[in-house]
């Protein structure tokens, strides 16, 4: 008991000393002319970050479903877990871009909301790939809308538009084509061989 009281007293003394000696620095006044993104473009970027996070969570749900022992499609599971990681990384890169442009000084806690996953089960792999393609189309439309917002007057954020077009839109278009091709192949295999076709296709992912 004596040791406990002594420990508490020592902790109180250390806390007081820390409070007395900690350094408090004033925020220096520097020009904000370099912080030039406009509100509509900033809002669009924030919305796009949320779109990427929403897609990431949906892909996580897909990966978890195909990982079930009662479903057991490891190829599909790995494919969707990889897609979830990619979408999360997209969101992180957009956050980094906003930070680089001096835009994460307020409202950071509202930047990302944990979404409710719309769907958690699928009848087969083809249904999941079809949903994945729809999801990518939705994200692509959102990026295009953001590009249109940021490239038009009075915003003219050419650097951001080039970044979104050259990196994100390029990847989205390739991703859509890849998913469409996988879905076509899977449907052909299932039309011929049913569940065996899905089983064999899973091995290729």
UniProtKB/Swiss-Prot annotation:
Chain positions recorded as Fe cation 1 binding sites: 52, 87, 90
Phenotype reported upon loss of the gene: Embryonic lethal with some embryos displaying cuticle and nervous system defects. RNAi-mediated knockdown is lethal at second-instar stage at 25 degrees Celsius and first-instar stage at 29 degrees Celsius. Reduces Fer2LCH protein levels. RNAi-mediated knockdown in the midgut causes a growth delay and most flies die at the larval or pupal stage; lethality is partially reduced on an iron supplemented diet and enhanced in presence of the iron chelator BPS. Few surviving adults have a smaller and shorter intestine.
Disulfide bridge map: 41-150
Reaction catalysis annotation: 4 Fe(2+) + O2 + 4 H(+) = 4 Fe(3+) + 2 H2O
Induction (record text): Up-regulated by iron-supplemented diet in the anterior part of the gut of third instar larvae and adults (at protein level). Up-regulated by iron-supplemented diet in the lymph gland.
Pfam families (alphabetical): Ferritin (PF00210)
Tissue specificity as recorded in UniProt: Expressed in hemolymph and gut (at protein level). Expressed in the head (at protein level). Expressed in thorax and abdomen.
Name this protein carries in UniProt: Ferritin heavy chain
Native source species: Drosophila melanogaster
């Amino acid at each position: 008991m004596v040791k406990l009281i002594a420990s508490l007293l020592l902790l109180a003394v250390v806390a007081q000393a820390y409070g007395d000696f900690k350094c408090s620095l004033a925020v220096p006044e520097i020009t904000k002319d370099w912080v030039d993104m406009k509100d509509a473009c900033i809002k669009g970027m924030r919305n796009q970050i949320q779109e990427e996070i929403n897609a990431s969570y949906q892909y996580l749900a897909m990966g978890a479903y195909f990982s079930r022992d009662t479903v057991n499609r490891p190829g599909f599971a790995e494919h969707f877990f990889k897609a979830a990681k990619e979408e999360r990384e997209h969101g992180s890169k957009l956050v980094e871009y906003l930070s680089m442009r001096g835009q994460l000084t307020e409202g950071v806690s509202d930047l990302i909301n944990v979404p409710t996953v719309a769907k958690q089960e699928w009848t087969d792999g083809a249904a999941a790939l079809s949903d994945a393609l729809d999801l990518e189309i939705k994200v692509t439309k959102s990026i295009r809308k953001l590009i249109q917002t940021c490239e038009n007057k009075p915003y003219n954020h050419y650097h951001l538009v080039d970044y979104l077009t050259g990196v994100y839109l390029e990847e989205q278009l390739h991703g859509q084509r890849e998913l469409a091709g996988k879905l076509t192949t899977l449907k052909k295999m299932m039309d011929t061989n049913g569940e065996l076709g899905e089983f064999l296709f899973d091995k290729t992912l």
